């Protein structure tokens, strides 16, 4: 997977040698999940996609510990024909079916940013065809100012996705990378949008989590705004963390109505956040692997689409 954060060239690595990936996975049985992402891996034709997926399910490679494969893509929103009428649509879906037949879970992590993206009839057909393979479709999107910073938009998206057989998964906070300032939504506003949207859907759509920041220490969720000892604070918790012991643990940050990202926040009731090293102001050179570029699930390996 490409590093998602700028100014960290040492964290960027990529290879098109699938044997390297297979060898790594064979040596690391603790890895149970592989995420194919990018970029958008569904830009790849079926022969290239097969070159990555087939070795993961080939019993000769001894990768029985791989339980799930995920494909992160926005192609359902901008190119649903990829799964319906394109020349290799049938072959792609056949490949999905082979992953399912191997006994593994296959999840298409579909990005939809607005309800309008769910309207085309060809999308409904694409969703039906993917689900017919046995794959599941989980949906996620960033909160984008002037595009979807409205509870009604998210309510409609989640309801429609459930009706179509998709599973709402994440509302993300816009990453602090690139020229994203115009689209950034303050965390306080993002929490209000999420809460109001969440209140208007049934339990079937409440599989969704957010607003979540995929930051360097891990995935950080904004759980609310409250007062503690007379101080207004954000309540947050780690959905995923470099240190697994921090997962699920709540912590506080001083309320800032303009804060848009984790690095905009200041700890309160402590001199540091739980994920910050206690002994070092910076990560020392002898611990180069402490803060990789993108937080994943426990036992997960992310593979770049090349």
Regions found by a protein language model. Give the residues of each.
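Canonical Radical SAM [4Fe-4S] cluster-binding loop centered on the CxxxCxxC motif
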Residues: 1-13, 71
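Short acidic donor-binding/metal-coordinating loop in glycosyltransferase active sites
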Residues: 39
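Conserved AdoMet/S-adenosylmethionine-binding subsite of the radical SAM
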Residues: 18-29, 33, 42-189, 193-201
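Auxiliary Fe-S-binding modules of radical SAM enzymes
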Residues: 155-306
């Amino acid at each position: 997977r490409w590093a998602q954060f700028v100014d960290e060239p040492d964290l960027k690595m990529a290879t098109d040698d699938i044997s390297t990936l297979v060898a790594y996975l064979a040596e690391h049985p603790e890895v149970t999940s592989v995420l194919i992402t990018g970029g958008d891996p569904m830009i790849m034709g079926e022969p290239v996609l097969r070159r990555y997926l087939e070795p993961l399910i080939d019993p000769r490679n001894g990768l029985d510990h791989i339980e799930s494969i995920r494909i992160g893509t926005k192609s359902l929103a901008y190119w649903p024909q990829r799964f319906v009428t394109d020349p290799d649509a049938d072959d792609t879906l056949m490949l999905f079916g082979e992953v399912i037949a191997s006994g593994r879970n296959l999840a298409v992590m579909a990005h939809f940013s607005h309800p309008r993206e769910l309207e085309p009839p060809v999308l409904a057909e694409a969703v039906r065809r993917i689900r017919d393979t046995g794959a599941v479709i989980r949906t996620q999107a960033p909160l984008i100012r002037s595009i979807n910073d409205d509870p009604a938009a998210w309510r409609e998206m989640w309801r429609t996705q459930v009706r179509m057989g998709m599973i709402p998964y994440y509302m993300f906070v816009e990453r602090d990378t690139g020229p994203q300032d115009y689209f950034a939504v303050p965390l306080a506003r993002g929490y209000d949008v999420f809460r109001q949207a969440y209140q208007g859907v049934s339990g079937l759509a409440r599989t969704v989590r957010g607003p979540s920041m995929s930051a360097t220490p891990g995935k950080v969720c904004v759980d609310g705004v409250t007062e503690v000892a007379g101080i207004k604070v954000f309540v947050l918790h780690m959905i995923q963390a470099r240190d697994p012991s921090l997962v699920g643990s709540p912590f506080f940050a001083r309320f800032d109505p303009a804060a848009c990202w984790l690095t905009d926040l200041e700890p309160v009731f402590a001199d540091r956040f739980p994920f910050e090293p206690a002994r070092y102001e910076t990560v020392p050179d002898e611990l180069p692997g402490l803060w990789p570029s993108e937080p994943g699930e426990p036992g997960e390996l992310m593979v770049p689409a090349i």
